[in-house]
């Protein structure tokens, strides 16, 4: 499948119109094309570097469902609140629940 987009290069601080070759949900090749401001923009997902998922009053899988629509693809999560209330059993629940979705939770 070939997709066309404006690729936001955060390192070079540039935007390039590109043709992306995608196979099995992975980008195989990127080729620059003539500039086209009407194409959708493609940029890396965001990582929330400090969050207490349990403060949202949501289980990790539901938190992920809502966060991903805003561009967040991962969190570095501090589970101290659930740990204070439920101990290791609560932390293990959060980890296990987070594994049910294609979102990356890093608990520490």
Model-derived features: positions:
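Alpha-helix N-cap/helix-start motif
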Residues: 15, 56, 84-87
């Amino acid at each position: 499948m070939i997709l066309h987009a404006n690729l936001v290069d955060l390192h070079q601080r540039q935007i390039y119109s590109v043709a992306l070759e995608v196979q099995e949900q992975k980008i195989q090749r990127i080729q620059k094309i003539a500039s086209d401001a009407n194409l959708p923009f493609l940029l890396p997902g965001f990582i929330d570097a400090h969050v207490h998922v349990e403060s949202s009053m949501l289980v990790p899988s539901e938190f992920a469902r809502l966060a991903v629509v805003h561009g967040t693809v991962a969190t570095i999560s501090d589970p101290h609140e659930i740990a204070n209330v439920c101990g290791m059993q609560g932390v293990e629940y959060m980890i296990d629940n987070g594994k049910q979705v294609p979102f990356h939770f890093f608990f520490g």
